[in-house]
Amino acid sequence: MNSPIDKLERKLGYQFKDAGLINLALTHRSANSKHNERLEFLGDSILSFVIADDLYHRFPKVNEGDMSRMRATLVRGHTLAELGREFDLGDYLKLGPGELKSGGFRRDSILADAVEAIIGAIYLDSDIEAVRGIVLSWYNSRLEAIKPGVSQKDPKTRLQEFLQGRRKPLPVYTVTNIKGEAHNQEFTVECDVAGVDKPVIGKGTSRRKAEQAAAETALEQLTNG
């Protein structure tokens, strides 16, 4: 057998005993009334625990604040979406017609949610130690590279400090669009920044996430010329 799911399982480093779990983890709410949001809820908590536990033992002298910032960096939607792209998850997602048409298989929030759902599915298919090993294998290079300190500050904080250090005005964030139902919204934010010609656009499942995405893009533009 060499089905598409077999190929994905090889990328994930885990073979499911219950194929229904991986299929459910890949099913977006737009595609079916049985979808991956409950698995996502479970996977989110498991991921947070596994990463927190690793950081606690990896950095025995680091304070709670730095560990929280490192964990936030590792479990944020952007990082999860990167993992999703490394697994080519977009090729396997089950989306409704509207999401397919709008390119949902490329959207950070959908990829990130699917990664969390897969973590939940692996846990239900095995146990906490098995899922811990899988998650740590996915995160190995990121855990080796991460260090406590300034780099773990969120993008809005880093952008503010960057501008303050150059005596420039603080950025102005404006919500320009909100679409979707209350439980599944996408926010679009414009960020006006001194030194950047056009407003920078950020999108996210909340206003805060959209502002953070815009701030991160603005920082990249300012620091890369």
UniProtKB/Swiss-Prot annotation:
Residue intervals of the DRBM domain: 154-224
GO cellular component: cytoplasm
Record-listed E.C. numbers: 3.1.26.3
Residues annotated as domain RNase III: 5-127
A GO MF label: ribonuclease III activity
InterPro entries, A to Z: dsRBD_dom, RNase_III, RNase_III_dom, RNase_III_sf
Cellular compartment(s): Cytoplasm
Cofactor section: Mg(2+)
rRNA processing keyword on record: yes
Pfam family, one: Ribonucleas_3_3
Reaction(s) this enzyme catalyzes, per UniProt: Endonucleolytic cleavage to 5'-phosphomonoester
Residue positions binding Mg(2+): E40, D113, E116
Swiss-Prot/TrEMBL keywords: Cytoplasm, Endonuclease, Hydrolase, Magnesium, Metal-binding, mRNA processing, Nuclease, RNA-binding, rRNA processing, rRNA-binding, tRNA processing
UniProt record similarity statement: Belongs to the ribonuclease III family.
Subunit organization: Homodimer.
Role noted for this protein: Digests double-stranded RNA. Involved in the processing of primary rRNA transcript to yield the immediate precursors to the large and small rRNAs (23S and 16S). Processes some mRNAs, and tRNAs when they are encoded in the rRNA operon. Processes pre-crRNA and tracrRNA of type II CRISPR loci if present in the organism.
NCBIfam families documented for this protein: RNaseIII
UniProt cross-references to PANTHER family, sorted A to Z: RIBONUCLEASE 3 (PTHR11207:SF0), RIBONUCLEASE III (PTHR11207)
Protein name stated in the entry: Ribonuclease 3
Annotated source species: Vibrio campbellii (strain ATCC BAA-1116)
Lineage of source species: Bacteria, Pseudomonadati, Pseudomonadota, Gammaproteobacteria, Vibrionales
Gene assigned in the entry: rnc
